[in-house]
């Protein structure tokens, strides 16, 4: 494609934006929330938006897609940004709004677990509302990552064996294959404040790092969020 419109600025959206932009494609990203990567630390999304724009990617945040129309010049995506109508046309449109768990049809009629309409409800042991039936992975977890599902499986079996789980499902490492790459683990600064945890933040730039200099990204940094009293 010579032009691509990506609806959704989460992990999948920005990874494809980076990939197609590097191939010379004209890329536009439309995100409904106030920044890219809304599920990660605010600074990551804000800095990534600047980097993508520097790479030629157009980014529209706080923008809601209204409709997509087929025309002679391609597909036109109509959207509103803070109430103002706008549109962008591309040869193709990628829907990166997210994925829905596919659990329907797994249970017999009359034997349905409690759900919120999307995910299956489980307790702290991974057990559903049906005694003896457990659920792990995308069907029950808000974090749709393969290593999270694997960790949930390990924890579930350990609990069934009356052992204390050896994994921490609240400390999930993750990465984003954009340029430069992003990696994170643990609570964000906003998460800590939302839980009334006193936090202190340390940050250093990586401008002198060899990888940063060779790649020429120019905005690499490391950020550590720790408990203000214990430093952990």
Range-by-range predicted roles:
Residues 1-2, 87-160:
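FAD-site-proximal beta/loop scaffold in flavoenzymes
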Residues 1-5, 11-85, 142-150, 158-191:
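Rossmann-like dinucleotide-binding cores of NAD(P)H-dependent redox enzymes
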Residues 57-58, 133, 199:
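Short, conserved active-site loop motifs that form the nucleotide-linked donor/cofactor pocket
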Residues 69, 85-86, 127-128, 132, ...:
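Solvent-exposed alpha-helices and their adjacent loops that cap or buttress functional pockets
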């Amino acid at each position: 494609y010579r032009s691509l419109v990506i609806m959704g600025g989460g992990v999948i959206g920005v990874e494809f934006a980076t990939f197609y932009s590097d191939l010379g494609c004209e890329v536009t990203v439309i995100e409904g929330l106030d920044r890219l990567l809304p599920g990660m630390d605010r600074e990551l999304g804000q800095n990534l938006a600047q980097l993508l724009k520097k790479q030629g990617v157009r980014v529209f945040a706080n923008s809601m897609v209204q409709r997509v129309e087929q025309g002679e010049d391609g597909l036109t995506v109509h959207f509103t940004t803070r109430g103002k109508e706008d549109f962008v046309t591309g040869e193709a449109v990628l829907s990166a709004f997210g994925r829905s768990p596919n659990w329907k049809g797994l249970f017999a009629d009359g034997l349905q677990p409690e759900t919120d309409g999307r995910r299956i409800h489980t307790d702290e042991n991974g057990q559903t509302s049906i005694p003896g039936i457990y659920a792990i992975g995308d069907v029950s977890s808000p974090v749709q990552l393969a290593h999270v599902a694997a960790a949930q499986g390990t924890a579930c079996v350990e609990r069934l064996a009356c052992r204390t789980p050896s994994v921490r499902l609240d400390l999930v490492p993750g990465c984003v294959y954009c340029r430069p790459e992003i990696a994170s683990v643990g609570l964000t600064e906003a998460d800590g404040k939302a839980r009334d945890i006193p936090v202190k933040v340390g940050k250093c730039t990586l401008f002198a790092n060899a990888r940063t200099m060779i790649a020429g990204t120019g905005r690499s940094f490391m950020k550590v969020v720790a408990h203000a009293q214990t430093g952990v």
